[in-house]
Structures are given as structure tokens and as C-alpha cells.
């Protein structure tokens, strides 16, 4: 019998922080030498994002071991999220509150099992915003990650480079059913 997956939602960072860091470290192990992917850089972003409106995280556990995560927060028309995307996104997205999916990751043994989609959908299920946006490195997995998001209904919106150490990312958006 396959162990069941337990999805837990967190609205506070403290009880989830170490598990988020642990899974991130495992998921991004081959990139941790790059400044943007260093655990310290992720921890700084995580702490900053938690202070932003609407923060929520979902962690997946198998037998109490964290195996995947996603976290998001709300962005509005004045948020730097939108200001860094070129070309400028349509007002249809920027003139309202939307969910920004900041991070999602699943440990290697559980990739390709649908866990990422379960985490994603659980995170969005309780949201009231009409759209969700994310940024993806179009080179991740030789384009596989971008194609996965397209299969989930996301469409390209533009490009963004959130920091000088960051790769150029593709901003994507989709409606929340």
C-alpha cells in the first residue's frame, strides 16, 4: 500500500519555515552554488514574502516527512511584481489583486506523481482572487517546467529579471476557477 500524502496549509511562517528551507535545499541542490539560488537568498526572500499580504504556504508530507511545497501571496497594481515584467502586463491583471505563486518545489522521488499539482490546487482552492501569476526559468528542465505550467493552463505574460543575480524569467498567468 502506498503511503498517503498529507497536505497542510500554513498562514504563519514560523511552524513551516524549517520544512520549507529543508525541501528547498533538496529540490534546488544542483543550483545552490549560484547566488540567486543560495539557501540564504531563499531564506531572505521567504522572510520578506511572509510579511506581504495574503501569504500562505502548502506543504506536502508523506509519513510526516516534508516532500514538497508552494507558497504565495497577494499582489496589487502597485506591486514590484508587475513593474519588473516587460512588456507591461494588461490592466486586466494589474488593476486588481491577484495571487503570485512565489515558489513551488517537490523532492525528486515524488516528481511526476502529481504531487506538485495537488499542492498548487490546494493552495489556490481557498483564494478569492481571479488570477494567479508565477515566474519560471524557461530553461529549467530544458523547458519541461514551463511546459508543465502550460499544461496546467498558464499562459506567457512577459519576461522579468527580479534581481541582477536572477535568470531572466517568463511571467505566466491563468484564471483561478
Label each PLM-derived region with a short phrase:
Residues 125-139:
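Conserved GNAT acetyl-CoA-binding A-motif
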Residues 65-68, 144:
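Glycine-rich acetyl-CoA-binding "A-motif" of GNAT/NAT acetyltransferases
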Residues 100-108, 112-125, 147-151:
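Conserved acetyl-CoA-binding loop-helix of GNAT-fold acetyltransferases
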Residues 24, 149, 154:
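Conserved active-site tyrosine of GNAT-family acetyltransferases
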Residues 136-142, 158-177:
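C-terminal "cap" of GNAT-fold acetyltransferases
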Residues 71-103, 162-164:
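Conserved acyl-donor/pantetheine-binding loop and adjacent beta-alpha core of acyl/acetyltransferases
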Residues 1-44, 57-66:
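Short amphipathic alpha-helix that is part of the acyltransferase structural core
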Residues 47-59, 74-80, 100:
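A short helix-loop-beta-strand connector motif used in the catalytic cores of GNAT acetyltransferases and
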